Each structure stands twice: as C-alpha cells, then as structure tokens.
C-alpha cells in the first residue's frame, strides 16, 4: 500500500519543488509542520475505532493550501543522504538545490503527475478501507480477498506506467487537527516516526469516537532513506500479535512534539514536556565524538507494558526510533489514560541547533501498515502524558502467556477499571448478590461495555463466565433484559439459579400455562417492573405477537435494557448447530434499533464469528475473546471396535471414574438404548436419553442424572447437554464420531465445568464416516453448498482423529484460529496430557509419493470419477472400497484383484496402510463416492480426488508418518496418591456437604449445585471451619445464602472444626487403634500438648502384654492415618509430634477402654447453638 503512496508523491514532486522553494521564505517556522500535516483528508471510517481524548475545545483547523513540503529534506552533496535543517537557524538553505534541466522539466510532468496522483490515491484509499476491515487473525479466511487482490493489481499497473516520474517528494495529510500550530515558534524539521502496524477492524468503535487528531502515514523520498532488509520484529503478547519481516519506517517532521521516555523496566509512560526535559525536538544532540550527528531517543513502548525488543542492526543511528520495532502498535494498544488534559497546550521551544544529516530509514514495502494502525501509532507517540517518573497506576496491562493469546486485548482498555458512574453499584451487587470477589478474564471489560450501551460479542469457553457478563448488567441497569436461549432446559436451569440469588427473573416458553404467562405479561406492563431478566426461546420471539407487543411497550417506555443472544453460533449457517429461528432474530435490530445487543457463544471459528455479527446486524460490536483452551480437560482418542464399544466404555469407567457422573454420546437412538442396557447389565447405573422418549421420561432421566439419584451415566444423542449446567461431569465419552470440530468441542466441553480435571474420550472408527456422510446427504434442509460445508466439517474431525503426531489440544485450538498456543502445554501439565503427547514418538516420516502415484494410476484404470458409480465405466473397471484397496495394496489373499498395485505395500503393517489410504482421502488425492444399495446400505467406493493429477505431475509430494504398532487401549497404571490425614478429612467433609446440598435441593426444589457450586463446596471443605466470617470470604457464599442454608452447612462443618481450632482440640481426647501408634517404632504416634492419648493414659505394662492380631497385614502407617492421632491447624500451621502432658498417665482408664473398641473414631463435640447471627438458625425441619 505504501508503495502506492510513494508513486503518488513522485507524480507531483517535481512540479512542486520550485513552488515550495519560492514559498519557503514566506513560511513561518511553525507552518512547515502544519503544511506537512494538512495533505490527506481522512474518511470517517478511518478513525471510528479511535477513542477520543475529549478535549475541552475543538482544535483549530489548518489551511490545506500547501500540499507538499519537499524542502524539509535536503540532498547532501557528499553522501546523498537527506539532511534535516531548522528553518530558523538556516533560512538560506530552505530553497532546494536542483539542476536547471530538472527545474525546466518539472512543469511538464505536473499535470500528468497530478492526474496519476488522484488515481493512485483513490486506489490506495480503497485498499486501506479493505485492509482496515480485516483483523489479523482473520487474514487466513478473509471474505474480500478477491477484491483486495484486484485493487493491488490495479495499483501495480499504475506504478508500472509511472516509472518515468520522479518520486522525490513528500505528501502530508490535509486536514489534520494537531497541536503543531499551537506554537508558531516551534522548530519544524524534527522527525516523527510512524511505523507499520496491523490492520484493525472497525469492531470496537463507538459512534462518538471521531474527534481524535489523526495522522495518515506519509511516504518519503526513496533516495533519502536506506533499506533495512529482513528485519524480524519480536512478536507482542497481544490478542492479535504477528511476526512481520521487511518492515518499513517512515519519518515525518511535524512541529516539536514531546518524547516518551523508556523506564528501566521496559515500559514507557508518555511524558508531558517540561522545561528541563523538552528541547523542542524529538531528536537530541549527543555529546562526545558523535556530537556532529543527531540521534533519536530510545523508542517508547506502549503504555500497556507490552514487550517488544529492539532488533535493528547495531550501529545504526536510527535504530533507537520506536517505529523500528513497534510495528504491531495499533488501536489495540491505545490507552486513553496516556493523554493528558493539557496535551493541546503549546510547548515552549528552545533554540534550534544546526541540523545534521537525517538518519537512514527503511523504505516502504507492500503489505505495510493500514491507515488506522499508523494513525494510532502516531497519535500515541505524539501525545504527551504523565511524567515518566510518576506513571499512572492501573494503566499497565501485563503481557499474557502464549497459552492464552486471545485475552486482555488492549483495545478494551477504556472499559477497564472502576471509573464509571455505575461502578459503585455494580460492585455492590457483584459482592452481595453473586458473592464473588474477583472477575475472570474479560468479564469486567464486557460488563462495563454493556453498561455503557455498546453492542458486545463475547466468545468464551465453557466455564469462562459468560452468564455473568449479562446477568450483572441486568441487575444494575434499569428495565428488563431479554435473554434468548435455544433450549427450555437451559432456560429453566438459569432461572432457577438466579432465584437462589434473589434476582427477579422468569421465562416465557411454549409449555407454561396461560395463567403463568398472564402473570408475567402483567408484571411487564407495570410502571416499574420488578423483572430484571426475561428468558425466551427464539421460536417464542418469532411467533408470539403478544410477546412482541409487550417488548414494544417496554421499548416505548425506555425499559427495554438489552437483548442477549445466548448460544449465538446457532445464528450462523456455517455453524455446527444452525437454526432458522435464530437467523430471524435480526428483526429485533430492525424493530428496536436503539436497544443494545449482546451475543455469546463458546464455539465459533473466525468465519462463524463474522457471520454472527452480520446476521444480527450488530452495530460496531465490542469483541471480547478468550483462549479456547480448557486447561482442565484431558483429550484422548482410542480405536473403536463397533461391537465392543459399550464394553470398552464400561471397562474405562470402572477403571478411572467408578463413582463419578459422565456422559456417553451415541450416534443413534438405538445405540443409546443398547449401550445403556449393557451398562445396566454390568451393574452401572445408566439411562438412555434421546428424542424418542416422551417429554416426561426425558425430564425424569435428566433429573435423576443431574441429582445423581439412580443414574451415574447418561447415554444420549448429541442434542443432550446444551441446556445442562452440571458442573461435576468428570468424563464425556464419544462412542461415535462427532459431525464437526465445533460439535466435539462443545460436547466434550460439558465435562469439568467446575475447573476440576476431567476426561474427554473419543472412540474412533473410519466406518462412522460413511454413516455420517449418508446422514448429511439425507438432510432435507440445505442445498449442495451447505452439504459440502458439512462434509468439510466432518473431514476436519476425521483429520483430528487420524493425526497421531500433533497435540490434540493444539489441533482443536488451531481450528478456531488460535495458532500461537504454547506447544509445551501438555508437557508442562502432565495431569492433562493428551494421548499424542504422552505417546512415545514411535513414528517416522516417509515420502510415499511413488507409492501414491501407483495407487492413483490403479484407480484411474480400474475406478471412475466422482459420481460415476451409476454411469458408464471403462472396460475392466470395478467398485473398490477403501478396505478392498488396502487388501490389494498389502497383497492379501482375499484381494479382489491381483495385479497393478497388488502386494506393493507388503512392507507396511495393515494399520499403516489403512491410515495411508485415509490420509489420501483427507488430502483429496482420493475421494469416496457414496452408493445406496437395494438394502438401504451405504457403501463408499474409491474414486480419484481433485489433487490426484497434481501428484502425477510432480507438483505435490506426499509425506506419511508411519507408526510401529496399531493404537490400542493403553494400559495405564492407576496412580495411588498417599493422602494425608487432613486431606482425608477434607474429602469426607466434601462428601457430607454434597449430600447436605442434595437434601436442601429437594426441599427447595432446585439443583443441588445451584445452592453451592462444586468449587465453592470444595473451598468450604478445605477450610474445615464453621466460622461464618471465614465462609463469607469464599466466592459463591453470600449472606443471603447463609441465611437460607447456613445452619445446615455449619452443622456439618462443626464436626471438622477441631482440625483448625486448637481450643476445640484441647477439649477432645483422641484414641488410637490397637497396634498403631502404640507399637514400637511407629512413625505416626503424635498428639497435641494438651491432648492425652489413651495409650499413654493406661498401665505402663500394657505395651508388653498387648498382642498383635494374627491376621493384621496392613501397614502401620495406614492404620495410623485412619486413626486420627495427628492434629492439624488451619492458616498454614504445621502439625507436629506432641509431647505428653504432665499427668497424662493418670488419665481415666475407663474412658480409654471405652473408646478403644470404637476403631479409632474421631471425638465429635456437640454442635454449637448459634445466638449472634440470625441466619444461622435452621431454615427447615426434616420430617
């Protein structure tokens, strides 16, 4: 793009040199910079993303009369480099030195150059608009690629036609409102460096963001700058970081601007100029041996403390310029807090010293920074801010690790913090209603953006906290928030959870009674409705005139707060779960244009994300994304034996999760019933769930599984689970191949929502591909293009399963556009390592191009093209499936033909040959043509693929990873962890708390995990404390919940409170089991100073008289650990071996003998009777 600008300058440069030279004597010193910055008109779309500094008064506009300032740079007669001269110190040098012939010919090129300039500028403007609309992470799938390439070709053609023109001129923007004219005495000629950046989409802009002074990147004299080739810039740890080479640096010379200084930590605060630190120029004159040369100060990094190291060649005097490295600085790094209120004020200049030759810079190259990137780079670099010695707190954003590259986008800096009018009320509700104490990634920014009336698109993985992003704003905002959700079960679960938080919410679905619906409509029609969240289905919105009338009534009274589209991937036809009623939701934007909209999803690749925003007609939405990585999930793919898959599931469950809840996904209803029956027969509580059951039966099965009442495993089709927020699902097993990566990610993501380690297991067989292809072809809805999309999604899933080399986690994230994930994540977290990373690298890469060519020729000779099964065939052609081809290639006796490639693959194992042929299908070298037999069976026959000819022509090489052995169910040794006694008590306490919540759930008719989540219960158990003040510090525990359920919870915690309270422990006597602590040499005999052991309280001769039980084969440590002879203290206190208290031998033997037979049970004190807190009183009575 920037080369186009260079040619543009060249067209008019010669014709204007003379005129500029004549005018130079009339120019004021401050006017030079102004003329430079007044050449390019900016479109409104060029700076919609910019956050304005909100100045007190509008900046004055500048005259666009002078278009070019070529006299700023002066050709050096000695070395040919450009020299920068001050206009006050050397006014006689302002006239350019040109040869006479060049001056005479400049007028002849003026008209032609001006015409060419207009053409090139128009082309450049179009390209800029296109590039500005493309985020970097979408460049691989941009929708305007064709148009962009056409514009680039047109530009090259224009540049070729203008080869005879001189390009030694500089263009400046026309209408740039900047601070350069505030001080007419400011010395011009100081370079402003504008480095390249990335294209930034208009996502995230606001209608008011159009007042920031902007700078369009300028192209400078190509003869005045040297080239820095292949300069690799460090990647910034930001959401859309990238690596770029062959970058360019552009130096301009507006009036004096303050220079940010780099602190010792590598971060920079934009400093407001002062008398001591500001010298009227960005260039400082060094002392010593280099006193004759100017140097540019160290480049500032962004105020967000992003790390970008300097990579310019050593010794280059210009290497300190911040543009050399800060090529990724763009809107995402813009921080409004970096601007000072008085940034427009004039700066007192100093005497301009004699100007030395200008430093050398790299020329422009194709693919350079877009307009908006350079605009923000120049604006951020030129705007004064706080002094570097006193940086503003809260402005820095630490760089994230590569494992989460899509979080903390600096473009959302203006939504961070608690500086808004709603912040106080929001925090109050956040703490008191939701019982939370800290926000997760992007939650605070998304909530603030919603409360500021922005459209928001939120992409967070399951468990990332999407619901809070609209529930908390709904509680803060006036009016009703309408939430559109796809499933009734999901709606009921969300409303139920909100009611436990005392948040007014309700729902309107097709199955509620007319009386209940009338009550809801009556409430909505009130002057001040108490309902904060109204949940509806998309079908209800599209079909119910009564609901639309109620919404219009709220809209007219300005009580319609926002629309929330949950599971927004259903909107896109490119998504894995497209629904027509979702696509019709754009009617909400048309009917209620001013109502903000929020779309949320956990599964959407870049293409689907863009389609969702377009379909819903969202207005410049703020996009909040997170890493798709689910850090607590362990991914495995195992080979499937279709007739034994149910037994394989059973064995795996009994081995790894014998008592945990899980889901088994099956392809058909029949498989659900069959799998559930086999599991039940083997003693595992399993039930089937599919559309063939009645509504009442489905609800019953779901309720049993959710509450763990007679159902541990649910065997379901893929439709199950979207509406269930059960947090403690420890495993998800796919007994059949999913239809797409998106579907697999969402279905497997239903495990481990509480953050605990969970398994995602997939049984894979290529035979499932044929079944799924048939289902896709039988779909009534959709055209051939939609079917092809589904086929592509299916083969992406097959490729995931066939890949035995790359990490499973990295494959999933790469599909969603997250390509810079930490490749060592599995190695760094062995508890969730995937099967590919845990497997030894027992494969070797082999070039199999020759073998593949033989296979292609065989298929050409014996098989047909796609769609040729029922058509005319060549003589001798046949129908061969992949399995038949494998037999022929291996040279098996059962092969249908024993010629051609017969036996050529005898050196391979059958497993590798099968993988090779499947790879050829995935790589589109071969293809499969589906044929339906008379018995309604689907058979896939091998035909040539679209890339077969490329292989034959030698244009495509085939690499294959050959493994030594076929994959099988690995025999992994179950790790037996030795738990300390306190850990055992925590586990026992957690079990009792869970049972208590289940009892409370039955009484209050809510799911037990909606009372306290699994993670909250675990934190409560880990405290082993019954102190309400301690419990209130835990996320998810509020005073309202303690008032409802506190008595029962504290009653359980009282049993374990002596583990944390020494005073309580002092009142108890703990006995040990016979033969444990009392045996000689035991390592576990311990007691507190004030606790008397029953062993030491008895007769001293008791040790010699006691006999060991003859059948005792257990270890001493195990007996002791269950005996409870150690006392632990909370708050980090260490347990220690206790000395016997004086007089311990005089303890009552009666008490000792009475307790000895109890088998080392803990002594439990009576529960305390609460008196100080009213909410500790029991709230119910168990009959």
From Swiss-Prot:
GO terms of molecular function: 3'-5' DNA helicase activity; ATP binding; ATP hydrolysis activity; ATP-dependent activity, acting on DNA; DNA binding; DNA helicase activity; forked DNA-dependent helicase activity; four-way junction DNA binding
Ranges of Basic residues composition bias in the record: 1133-1142
Catalytic reaction(s) noted: Couples ATP hydrolysis with the unwinding of duplex DNA by translocating in the 3'-5' direction; ATP + H2O = ADP + phosphate + H(+)
Biased composition annotated in UniProt, kind: Acidic residues: 38-48
GO biological process: DNA double-strand break processing; DNA replication; double-strand break repair via homologous recombination; protein complex oligomerization; protein homooligomerization; telomere maintenance
UniProt keyword terms in alphabetical order: ATP-binding, DNA damage, DNA repair, DNA replication, DNA-binding, Helicase, Hydrolase, Isomerase, Metal-binding, Nucleotide-binding, Nucleus, Zinc
Entry's free-text remark on domains: The N-terminal region mediates dimerization and homooligomerization. Both the helicase ATP-binding domain and the helicase C-terminal domain form intramolecular interactions with the HRDC domain in a ATP-dependent manner. The HRDC domain is required for single-stranded DNA (ssDNA) and DNA Holliday junction binding.
Matching PANTHER family: DNA HELICASE RECQ FAMILY MEMBER (PTHR13710), RECQ-LIKE DNA HELICASE BLM (PTHR13710:SF153)
Protein name as catalogued: RecQ-like DNA helicase BLM
Organism: Gallus gallus
Gene: BLM
């Amino acid at each position: 793009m920037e080369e186009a600008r260079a040619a543009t300058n060249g067209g008019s440069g010669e014709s204007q040199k003379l005129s500029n030279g004549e005018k130079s004597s009339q120019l004021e010193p401050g006017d030079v910079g102004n003329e430079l910055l007044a050449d390019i008109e900016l479109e409104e779309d060029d700076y919609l993303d910019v956050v304005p500094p909100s100045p007190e008064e509008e900046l004055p506009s500048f005259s666009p009369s002078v278009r070019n300032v070529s006299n700023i740079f002066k050709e050096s007669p000695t070395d040919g480099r450009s020299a920068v001269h001050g206009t006050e110190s050397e006014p006689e040098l302002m006239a350019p030195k040109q040869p006479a012939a060049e001056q005479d010919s400049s007028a002849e090129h003026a008209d032609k150059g001006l015409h060419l300039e207009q053409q090139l500028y128009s082309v450049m403007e179009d390209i800029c608009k296109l590039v500005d609309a493309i985020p970097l992470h979408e460049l691989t799938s941009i929708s305007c690629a064709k148009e962009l390439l056409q514009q680039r070709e047109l530009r090259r053609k224009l540049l070729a036609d203008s080869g005879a023109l001189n390009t030694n001129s500089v263009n400046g923007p026309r209408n740039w409102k900047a601070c350069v004219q505030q001080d007419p005495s400011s010395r011009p000629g100081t370079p402003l460096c504008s480095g390249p950046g990335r294209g930034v989409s208009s996502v995230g802009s606001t209608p008011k963001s159009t007042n920031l002074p902007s700078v369009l990147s300028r192209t400078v004299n190509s003869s005045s700058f040297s080239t820095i080739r292949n300069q690799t810039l460090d990647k910034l740890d930001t959401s859309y970081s990238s690596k770029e080479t062959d970058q360019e640096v552009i130096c301009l010379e507006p009036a004096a601007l303050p220079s940010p200084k780099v602190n010792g930590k590598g971060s920079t605060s934009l400093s407001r100029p002062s008398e001591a630190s500001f010298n009227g120029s960005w260039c400082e004159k060094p002392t010593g041996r280099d006193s004759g040369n100017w140097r540019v100060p160290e480049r500032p990094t962004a105020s967000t403390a992003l790390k970008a190291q300097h990579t310019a060649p050593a010794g280059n005097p210009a290497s300190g310029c911040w543009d050399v490295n800060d090529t990724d600085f763009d809107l995402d790094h813009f921080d409004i807090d970096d601007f000072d209120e008085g940034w427009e004020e004039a700066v007192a200049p100093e005497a301009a010293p004699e100007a030395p030759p200008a430093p050398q810079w790299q020329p422009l190259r194709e693919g350079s920074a877009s307009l908006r990137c350079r605009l923000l780079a120049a604006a951020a670099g030129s705007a004064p801010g706080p002094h570097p010695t006193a940086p503003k707190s809260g402005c820095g954003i630490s760089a994230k690790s590569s494992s989460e590259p899509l979080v903390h986008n600096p473009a959302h800096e203006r939504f961070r913090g608690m500086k808004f009018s709603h912040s106080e009320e929001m925090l109050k509700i956040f703490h008191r209603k939701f019982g939370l104490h800290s926000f997760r990634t992007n939650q605070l920014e998304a909530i603030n953006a919603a409360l500021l009336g922005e459209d928001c698109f939120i992409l967070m993985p399951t468990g990332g906290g999407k619901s809070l992003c609209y529930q908390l704003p709904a509680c803060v905002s006036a009016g009703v928030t309408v939430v559109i959700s796809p499933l009734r079960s999901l709606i009921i679960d969300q409303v139920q959870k909100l009611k436990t938080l005392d948040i007014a919410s309700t729902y309107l679905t097709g199955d509620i009674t007319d009386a209940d619906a009338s009550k809801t409509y009556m409430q909505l029609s009130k002057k001040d409705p108490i309902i904060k969240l109204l949940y509806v289905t998309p079908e209800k919105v599209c079909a119910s005139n009564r609901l639309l009338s109620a919404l219009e009534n709220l809209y007219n009274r300005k009580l319609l707060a926002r629309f929330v589209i949950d599971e927004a991937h259903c909107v896109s036809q490119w998504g894995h779960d497209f629904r027509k009623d979702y696509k019709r939701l754009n009617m909400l934007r048309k009917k209620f244009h001013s109502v903000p909209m929020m779309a949320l999803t956990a599964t959407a690749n870049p293409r689907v994300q863009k389609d969702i925003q377009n379909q819903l007609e969202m207005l410049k939405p703020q996009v909040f994304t997170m890493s798709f990585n689910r850090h607590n999930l362990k991914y495995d793919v195992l080979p499937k034996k279709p007739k034994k898959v149910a037994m394989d599931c059973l064995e795996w469950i009994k081995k790894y999760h014998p008592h945990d809840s899980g889901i088994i996904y099956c392809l058909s209803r029949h498989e659900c019933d069959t799998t559930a029956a086999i599991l039940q027969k083997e003693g595992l509580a399993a039930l089937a769930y599919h559309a063939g059951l009645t509504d009442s039966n489905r609800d019953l099965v779901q309720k049993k599984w959710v509450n763990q009442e007679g159902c541990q495993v649910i065997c379901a089709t893929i439709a199950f689970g979207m509406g269930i927020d059960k947090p403690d699902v420890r495993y998800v097993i796919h007994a059949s191949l999913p239809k797409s990566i998106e579907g697999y990610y969402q279905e497997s993501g239903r495990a481990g929502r509480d953050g605990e380690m969970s398994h995602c297991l997939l049984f894979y067989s290529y035979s499932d591909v044929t079944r799924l292809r048939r289902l896709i072809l039988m779909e009534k809805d959709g055209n051939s293009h939609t079917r092809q999309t589904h086929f592509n999604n299916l083969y992406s899933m097959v490729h995931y399963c066939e890949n035995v080399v790359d990490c499973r986690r990295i494959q999933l994230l790469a599909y969603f556009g997250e390509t810079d994930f930490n490749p060592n994540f599995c190695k760094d977290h062995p508890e969730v390592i995937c099967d590919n990373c845990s497997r030894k690298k027992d494969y070797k890469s082999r070039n199999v191009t020759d073998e593949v060519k033989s296979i292609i020729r065989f298929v050409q000779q014996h098989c047909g093209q796609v769609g040729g099964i029922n058509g005319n065939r060549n003589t001798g052609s046949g129908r061969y499936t992949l399995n038949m081809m494998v037999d022929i290639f291996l040279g098996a006796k059962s092969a249908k033909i024993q010629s051609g490639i017969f036996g050529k693959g005898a050196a391979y194992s059958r497993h590798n040959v099968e993988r090779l042929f499947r790879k050829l299908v995935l790589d589109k070298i071969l293809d499969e043509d589906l044929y339906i037999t008379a018995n309604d069976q689907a058979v896939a026959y091998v035909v040539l693929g679209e890339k077969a000819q490329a292989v034959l022509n030698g244009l495509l090489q085939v690499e294959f990873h050959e493994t030594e052995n076929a994959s099988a169910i690995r025999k992994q040794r179950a790790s037996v962890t030795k738990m300390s006694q306190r850990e055992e008590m925590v586990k026992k306490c957690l079990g009792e708390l869970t049972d208590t919540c289940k009892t409370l759930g039955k009484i209050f008719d809510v799911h037990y995990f909606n009372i306290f989540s699994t993670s909250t219960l675990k934190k409560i158990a880990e405290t082993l404390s019954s102190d309400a003040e301690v419990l209130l510090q835990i996320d998810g525990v509020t005073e309202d919940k303690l008032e409802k359920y506190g008595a029962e919870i504290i009653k359980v915690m009282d049993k374990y409170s002596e583990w944390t309270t020494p005073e309580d422990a002092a009142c108890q006597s703990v006995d040990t089991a016979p033969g444990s602590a009392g045996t000689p040499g035991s390592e576990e005999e311990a007691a507190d100073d004030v606790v008397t052991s029953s062993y030491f309280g008895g007769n001293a001769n008791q040790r010699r008289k006691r006999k060991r039980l003859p059948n005792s084969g257990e270890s001493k440590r195990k007996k002791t650990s269950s005996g409870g002879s150690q006392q632990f203290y909370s708050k980090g206190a260490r347990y220690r071996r206790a000395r016997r208290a004086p007089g311990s031998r005089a303890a009552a033997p009666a008490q000792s003998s009475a307790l000895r037979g109890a088998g080392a049970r803990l002594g439990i004190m009576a529960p305390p009777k609460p008196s100080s807190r009213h909410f500790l009183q029991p709230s119910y009575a168990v009959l």
